[in-house]
Curated annotation (Swiss-Prot):
Residues 399-496 form the Zinc-hook domain. One of its GO terms (molecular function) is ATP binding. The gene is rad50. Zn(2+) binds at C444, C447. Binds 1 zinc ion per homodimer. Homodimer. Forms a heterotetramer composed of two Mre11 subunits and two Rad50 subunits. Homodimerization is promoted by ATP binding. Binding of ATP induces a closed, compact conformation of the Rad50/Mre11 complex. ATP hydrolysis opens the complex. One of its GO terms (biological process) is double-strand break repair. Changing L802W: Destabilizes the ATP-dimerized state. Promotes HerA/NurA activity. Keywords: ATP-binding, Coiled coil, DNA damage, DNA repair, Hydrolase, Metal-binding, Nucleotide-binding, Zinc. This is DNA double-strand break repair Rad50 ATPase. It comes from the Archaea. Pfam families: AAA_21, AAA_23, Rad50_zn_hook. Residues 257-588, 629-735 form a coiled coil.
């Protein structure tokens, strides 16, 4: 695999970065925090998202303030170019882009469906994730793990050399062996449970024969029993039906005899009731004849009473309306007189209004000028309140003093800021010197002479004293800087407050000059007179508007008065006509009419009484007809009932001849005994059939178990063969894992020896790698003897860790064409960093493409291509150096 180009947008500090990689050693150089390692993380995300690395999360790698992240990679594998494009949306999964294509001719074509899952599956086949992460990509911290412990070193070796596949195979084969043993045990348990299967089959077959014989015996006697029971059931049913029919006929006969008695009683009562109705009819006919003789007087009474009611009602309404109309006429006449007086008043007020308007026109100019002066005086008052007790000269002087003080404070703050930066650098240098001095062995890194414990302690004491003094001074300077910045903020606020007051002072001076040139007393007097006249004008106009509104009502009132006078004349005419109609009936007054009505009223009351008799006669005649009809129907029903009684008595006599109670009881008892016997036999047969089916089912299961027993015996033989084969494989995997690890570690030891010898200028002749159970132990050979890692100085330990890790990658160089190293020199001293350049030129150039990330400028000499990354305004910038 070889990387060609990486495009990254909005990934951590990378806003828009494009990097092209070439064959040979590609050095990415830059200060810590510039975005070098972030570029490698972007490559990892582009190739293998979603990752199994905990510290790379989508919502965290998107650049602050950006909504999405874009990564585009072009790489070559086995002569084919591939391109992966990904776009991530912060906080969302929908809308993301994941695409992988290969170059066919001059056209990019998809190799998978455009999804993260499909690309991951394809990449796992093309370049497995573990191979890339362990063999190709040497991350920060892996060298520390090599030096941490024998167990941690074994884990790194296992991951890089992909020895986990042997461990996985060993575990899976062990699990398979356990499964086979469990299966064999299960099958042997089955054989033990079914050992007496033949005896059980024989016993069930004999029991089945016995049950079938018993069923056959019952089936022989059942038909005759069923036939006899059916015959008895029919005979008993016939006798029961006859008995029921006799009982029904007796009940019906008794009912019809009761019906006969009821009808005879009804006929007697109806005849008596009819006689009474005929007597009542005769009396009512006499009363009806009297109605005809008094009918004329009744009609006269009703006509006069109706006229009286109509006369009184109309007279009351006319007189009431006439009174209302006369009252309205008087009221409107008074209102018209009042409106005529208001017309004169309105003309007088109009003349007064004209005089006031003339006076207002003369005073208007002074009034306007007075309003302007009032506004200026109010403005002057407000401005003076803002200014307080200070003069414009005082404010100007204060501002000049504040500006001078601000300049002095800013100069002091800038000097302190510079001193703080110098002290921070000094503190950093002192900490580095202390750490290097603690780790240093042999020569003193300060003076170059031999480093004794006494000399080390003397230097450390001096450095710590200087460090504490610098920290104390730094703390005081930071406090003083904070104090100065607070004072600057206060001064800025005071300047901001005072500056507008200069403008206020100028406005006050201008307004006072304008007010001094006018005759304020005269203008104020005229303005007061203007306001007084204006108020009088408003009052007059209100009164005039009120009078005008009232005068609008005059014409409608005059029209309404004429209409009311006409209506009064009409009502008087109607009243006269009503009295004329009373006289036409022969009465001079209402009293005469009342006298005549009292005379006719007694006749009318008698008429009403007789009128009820006529209605009652009609009702009585209808009741007589109805009684006659009822009597006739009752005689007909009586004849029918007597005929029914005769027929039922005859039928009952015939039924009693067919039925014998003793015979019925005897046959019923015989039937019940036979039914019990039949039920017992059928239940016995059903139970035997159920037992038969159970035995058959048991036999089928036993025979199936017998067949299964033979199959299980064969399965056990096959499983025992598989178990033997699995045990052989487990031993082979175990041996091959040990051989593969030993062979790899032997070669890695040789390569590590060469590289470490370069680092130490031949001080150590060999690196010994020894594999143990879950451990990889490292030794160095010095003066012909193996020495543990504790024998090495701090710098030598770091060099050994780097040499060992490079050796593992070089061991895999025949299989890989790309190596990525992230910060391989963080703890190397200057001499060993120079040695690393020689190692890179000798060993790393064997790999077709190397990408090396470092902040160490010295490595440029060994690189074929140099790319510099720097941080500007929070974004990473890329520059191709060579």
């Amino acid at each position: 695999m070889k990387l060609e180009r990486v495009t990254v947008k909005n990934f951590r500090s990378h806003s828009d970065t494009v990097v092209e990689f070439k064959e040979g050693i590609n050095l990415i150089i830059g200060q810590n925090g510039s975005g070098k390692s972030s570029l490698l993380d972007a490559i990892l995300v582009g190739l293998y998202w979603p990752l199994r690395i905990k510290d790379i999360k989508k919502d965290e790698f998107t650049k602050v303030g950006a909504r999405d992240t874009y990564i585009d990679l072009i790489f070559e594998k086995d002569g084919t170019k591939y391109r992966i494009t990904r776009r991530f949306l912060k906080g969302y999964s929908s809308g993301e882009i994941h695409a992988m294509k290969r170059l066919v001719g001059n056209e990019w074509k998809h190799v998978t469906e455009p999804s993260s899952k499909a690309i991951s599956a394809f990449m796992e086949k093309l370049i497995p994730y573990n191979i890339f992460l362990n063999a190709i990509y040497i991350r920060q911290g892996q060298i520390d793990a090599i030096l941490e412990s024998d167990e941690a070193r074994e884990k790194v070796v296992r991951e890089v050399l992909n020895l986990d596949k042997f461990e996985t195979a060993y575990k899976k084969l062990s699990e398979l062996k356990k499964t086979i043993n469990n299966r064999i045990k299960e099958y042997r348990d089955i054989l033990a449970r079914t050992e007496n299967i033949e005896e059980l089959i024989k016993e069930n077959e004999q029991e089945l024969i016995q049950v079938l014989q018993e069923i056959s015996k019952i089936e022989e006697v059942l038909p005759s029993k069923r036939s006899k029971v059916d015959m008895l059931r029919k005979e008993v049913l016939r006798l029961e039906e006859t008995k029921v029919e006799i009982e029904n006929s007796e009940r019906l006969l008794e009912k019809r005899r009761g019906d006969k008695r009821t009808l005879e009683e009804r006929i007697k009562n109806t005849e008596e009731y009819l006689e009474k109705l005929k007597e009542k009819e005769k009396e009512l006919e006499e009363q009806v004849k009297e109605i005809t003789s008094i009918k004329k007087d009744v009609d006269a009474y009703l006509a006069l009473k109706e006229f009286k009611n109509e006369y009184l009602d109309k007279k009351y309404k006319i007189e009431k309306e006439l009174t209302r109309v006369e009252e309205l006429i008087n009221e409107i006449q008074k209102r018209i007189e009042e409106l005529n007086e208001k017309e004169s008043e309105k003309e007088k007020l109009e003349n007064e209004k004209k005089e006031i308007l003339n006076k207002l026109a003369i005073l208007e100019k002074d009034h306007q000028l007075y309003e302007e002066i009032k506004a200026k005086k109010e403005n002057l008052r407000q401005l003076k309140e803002k200014l307080g007790d200070k003069s414009p000269e005082d404010i100007k002087k204060l501002l000049e003093e504040l500006e001078t003080k601000k300049t002095t404070i800013e100069e002091e703050r800038n000097e302190i800021t510079q001193r703080i930066g110098e002290l921070k650098n000094k503190i950093g240098d002192l900490k580095t010197a202390i750490e290097e001095l603690k780790k240093a062995k042999g020569k003193c890194p300060v003076c170059g002479r031999e480093l004794t414990d006494e000399h080390r302690e003397e230097l450390l004491s001096k450095y710590h004293l200087d460090l504490n003094n610098s920290k104390n001074t730094l703390a005081k300077l930071i406090d003083r800087k904070s104090e100065l910045e607070r004072e600057l903020r206060r001064i800025d606020m005071e300047i901001k407050r005072l500056t507008p007051l200069l403008t206020v002072a100028e406005q006050i001076r201008s307004i006072e000059e304008e007010l001094n040139v006018v005759n304020l007393e005269k203008i104020e007097k005229n303005a007061t007179e203007y306001e007084k006249l204006l108020e009088e004008l408003r009052t007059l106009e209100g009164r005039i508007r009120g009078l005008a509104e009232d005068l609008k009502k005059l014409a409608p009132l005059e029209k309404k008065l004429a209409a009311l006078i006409h209506k009064k004349q009409e009502l008087e005419k109607e009243l006269k006509e009503l009295n004329t109609k009373l006289e036409s009936f022969g009465f001079k007054s209402v009293e005469d009419l009342d006298s005549k009505l009292r005379e006719l009223e007694e006749i009318y009351k008698r008429y009403l009484t007789l009128l009820n008799s006529k209605k009652e006669l009609e009702i009585t005649q209808r009741e007589i007809a109805k009684a006659k009809e009822t009597l006739e129907m009752s005689f007909e029903e009586l004849a029918e009932v007597e005929a029914d009684i005769e027929r039922i008595e005859k039928k009952l006599s015939q039924l009693k001849q067919k039925y014998n109670e003793e015979e019925y009881k005897k046959k019923r008892e015989e039937k019940e005994e036979l039914e019990k016997e039949l039920a017992r036999l059928e239940a016995q047969k059903k139970e035997l059939e159920k037992r038969r089916d159970t035995i058959k089912s048991t036999l089928e299961k036993l025979k199936a178990e017998k067949e299964n027993r033979e199959r299980v015996k064969k399965e056990i033989k096959d499983l025992e063969k598989a178990k033997d084969f699995t045990e052989e494989l487990i031993e082979k995997v175990k041996k091959y894992k040990a051989l593969a690890r030993e062979a790899a570690l032997s070669k890695i030891g040789e390569l590590a020896s060469e590289i470490f010898a370069e680092f130490t200028e031949g001080k150590y002749s060999e690196v010994v790698v020894r594999a143990e159970e879950n451990k990889v132990r490292l030794f160095v050979v010095w003066e012909g003897k193996e020495r543990p890692l504790t024998f090495l100085s701090g710098g030598e330990r770091i060099a050994l860790g780097l040499a060992f890790r490079l050796a593992m990658s070089l061991y895999l160089a025949g299989e890989i064409s790309l190596l990525i190293l992230d910060e391989p020199t963080p703890y190397l001293d200057e001499e060993r960093r120079r040695k690393l350049i020689t190692i890179m030129e000798r060993y790393l150039k064997k790999i077709p493409q190397v990408i090396l990330v470092s902040h160490d400028e010295e490595l440029k000499d060994a690189a074929d291509h140099v790319i510099r990354i720097s941080l500007e305004n929070g974004s990473s910038k890329v520059e191709v150096v060579s």
